[in-house]
Amino acid sequence: MFGRVSTLALVAGLAVGAPALNSRAEAAPSQAQVAAAAKAVQPKVIAWRRDIHEHPELGNQEVRTSALIAKELKALGFEVRENVGKTGVVGILKGGKPGKVVALRADMDALPVEEKTGLLFASKVKATWEGRTVPVMHACGHDTHVAMLLGTATVLAGMKKDIKGTVVLIFQPAEEGPQAGEEGGAKLMIRDGALDQPKVDAIFGVHVGPADAHLLNYRPEGFYASSDRLTITVKGKQTHGARPWAGVDMASVAADIIQAMNQIAARQVDVGASPSVVTIAVINMGMRQNIIPEDLVMGGTMRTFSTARRDDLIARVQKTVAAIGDRYGAKAEAVFTQPYPVTYNNPDLSKWVKASLEKASPGKVDDNAALVTGAEDFSLYAEKVPAVFVQLGGRKAGVPAATAPANHSPFFDVDEAVFETGVKAEVFMALDYLERK
């Protein structure tokens, strides 16, 4: 195990140029060569991941992370564009033979979560987020995504002259969403030309989760849900806590709204036809225990898998919230922002890519995965070019599936052995796509 002090030293000691893997310029890199290269780079991937995990950064604040990425890519001979989409990095590797352009994407941002993993390289970082000082943790595995894509960069750089086409590596900030009032994520990366300089023909992404280690799963067409940020504001009348009848009881308003949201999601729409979720996770009101405040702000999220269901739920939520406010003599409004569309896996690419994934993890590929109510702004890339988004299982040995910490948990961790599988999956998807007729 690498301790807290030795992690950076290990990265520095291993940060060397990638060796050439194939001296025959006319031949595509073989499966054995890719496997050997992925195995060789595994210690570096682990070191990168531990370093990034120990130094997490929130969305649009990934300055240290992006500097590390740019440094490593430049050392490998990539053409590097920095400050794309604020703190994003794009690395371009032009192969020795002409061909198409394929992109691979990793997200870089962490979450305002207090880490409880007990790892030697656990985060102790605090940062400012929306006016508050918060703990910061890589609780969704983005540290592993960056490390694996750097490993992929190392493997690809070692076979550059045998690559038929160009590989674009997109290291994206703010996938979890920017702070209120900011822009960020895939939207800004696309606006800054991440898919256009050069013009990308297809894009692939990998995301770790608590499934069986080394399992690669995905499904054609809709895979991850669409996502909308929900903000509910209520304006009432302040009163003393001892005289609630003289004002608007905001606690009762909040309780009724929460109950109504649960009713809408579970009782007013056909849950069998298309899954949907409406969740309230934030309630802000009041400063003293004996004063009923004038204002209430609630925050949540909505997840759907079809445009029709999304539009229907938005209308229902807005109508219901306004009606509850009227009932209490308050003005209540529901606003939906930061929409992410459904993450759509191109059917043709989904069928084709299974063979590439089988080479990365033989016998552990599921191309009929269940729908995921999580959301991803990778979906914005998939709106622009054909795409496939794949999940990589990373549950540690001995951890029961039923109790494995999920993404966004303060206990979330990943079996480091799966990084090698992730690197192979990314390399095979990229190379096989470029060799595809």
Feature locations, PLM:
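Bacterial N-terminal signal peptides
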Residues: 6-19
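Sec/Tat signal peptide C-region and signal peptidase I cleavage site
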Residues: 19-26
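Metal-dependent amide/peptide-bond hydrolase catalytic core
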Residues: 28, 75, 255-437
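Acidic/His- and Gly-rich active-site-bordering loop/insert found
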Residues: 28-138, 147-168
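Soluble non-cytosolic domains of exported or imported proteins
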Residues: 39-46, 56-67, 139, 143, ...
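Divalent metal-coordination and catalytic microenvironments
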Residues: 52, 91, 104, 142, ...
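Hydrophobic beta-strand positions in extracellular immunoglobulin-like domains
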Residues: 93, 234-236, 302
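Histidine/acidic-residue-rich, glycine-tolerant segments that coordinate divalent metal ions
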Residues: 126-137, 143-144, 155-156, 161-279, ...
